[in-house]
């Protein structure tokens, strides 16, 4: 579901702050969201914008509102993980087959430098920063298509999946993930659309399997 189309207000600010804390697991799945505490933490004087933000996040399945019980961070579901990766496996390789010749040398160079840097400093990597880079990378692979609807769908999926990845890999980033990104860049640089699609599909499948294999109580 698309992010709410609302004006730049306190509710917008609260929405962005709380959403990032949920996505990057600062607020844990199942955690109670106390309206008063959230309002104080964000530094607002009124409950109203925070309440509006939580309703918007409920519409994105990030917050659960239970009458007479309260508000909670939505739980992680293994079915949601597999469903999201299935969508990615269907859409992303096909899209890259179209956009591959359109991805600029500057984009390739930028991400190659970033992933090579991560590869060299893997033990001290800031995993939160890596996930933001990874999300931007996959969004930039589809960006040349100039399809805003597709971009919104995939962005929502990336944000949902980031929660699972934070839960699974925040202690250590599997090296194979970095190597697969570099392999994707190699095929794009060669303008080999068919090979790029195959490599990306393999990467998505491997990422899904790695998440499931962690068995961190996501079901």
How would you name each of these model-derived features?
Residues 152, 204-219:
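Short, charge-rich amphipathic alpha-helical segments embedded
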Residues 84, 96, 101-166, 177-186, ...:
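Conserved amphipathic alpha-helical segments that form helical-bundle/coiled-coil interaction surfaces
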Residues 9, 109, 172-176:
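Short helix-capping and inter-helix turn/linker motifs at the boundaries of alpha-helical repeat units
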Residues 18, 49, 80, 91, ...:
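Hydrophobic alpha-helical segments typical of transmembrane helices
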Residues 1-101, 213-219:
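Short linear motifs at protein or domain termini
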């Amino acid at each position: 579901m698309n992010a709410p189309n609302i004006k730049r207000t306190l509710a917008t600010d609260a929405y962005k702050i709380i959403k990032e804390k949920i996505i990057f697991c600062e607020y844990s799945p199942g955690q109670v969201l106390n309206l008063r505490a959230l309002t104080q933490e964000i530094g607002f004087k009124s409950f109203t914008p925070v309440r509006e933000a939580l309703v918007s996040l409920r519409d994105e399945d990030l917050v659960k509102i239970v009458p007479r019980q309260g508000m909670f961070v939505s739980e992680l579901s293994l079915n949601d993980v597999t469903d999201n990766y299935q969508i990615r496996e269907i859409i992303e390789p096909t899209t890259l087959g179209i956009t591959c010749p359109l991805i600029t040398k500057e984009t390739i160079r930028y991400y190659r430098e970033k992933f090579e840097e991560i590869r060299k400093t893997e033990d001290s990597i800031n995993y939160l920063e890596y996930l933001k880079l990874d999300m931007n990378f996959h969004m930039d692979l589809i960006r040349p298509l100039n399809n805003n609807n597709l971009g919104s769908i995939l962005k929502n999926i990336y944000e949902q999946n980031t929660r699972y990845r934070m839960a699974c890999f925040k202690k250590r980033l599997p090296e194979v993930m970095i190597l697969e990104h570099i392999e994707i860049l190699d095929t794009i640089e060669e303008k080999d659309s068919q090979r790029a699609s195959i490599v990306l599909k393999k990467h998505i499948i491997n990422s899904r399997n790695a998440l499931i294999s962690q068995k961190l109580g996501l079901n």
